[in-house]
Amino acid sequence: MRKDIHPDYRPVVFLDTTTGYQFLSGSTKASKETVEFEGETYPLIRVEISSDSHPFYTGRQKFTQADGRVDRFNKKYGLKDANAAK
């Protein structure tokens, strides 16, 4: 087998930027930032969502108000809701 074709697999700390939760895991992702975790220094990878903040794992649903195509059309052309007038 050829040598030095695979990236280095090493322990890194992932930081959930939403909740501040940190966890140690193995990864090949490189980072210039480091952090002290449990007495050791590890590379730091920032993530927007993890098991600590994902709705599937937390049981909290995050609802966003997304207008449908019809609502956007009516808003764009200034049409009122026909059902609201009745």
From Swiss-Prot:
Keyword presence, Ribonucleoprotein: yes
Pfam family, one: Ribosomal_L31
Any GO molecular function: structural constituent of ribosome
UniProt keyword list: Ribonucleoprotein, Ribosomal protein
UniProt KW Ribonucleoprotein keyword: yes
PROSITE patterns according to UniProt: RIBOSOMAL_L31 (PS01143)
Coiled coil: none
GO biological process: translation
InterPro entries for the chain: Ribosomal_bL28/bL31-like_sf (IPR034704), Ribosomal_bL31 (IPR002150), Ribosomal_bL31_B (IPR027493), Ribosomal_bL31_sf (IPR042105)
GO annotation, cellular component aspect: ribonucleoprotein complex; ribosome
Family: Belongs to the bacterial ribosomal protein bL31 family. Type B subfamily.
Subunit structure: Part of the 50S ribosomal subunit.
Protein name stated in the entry: Large ribosomal subunit protein bL31B
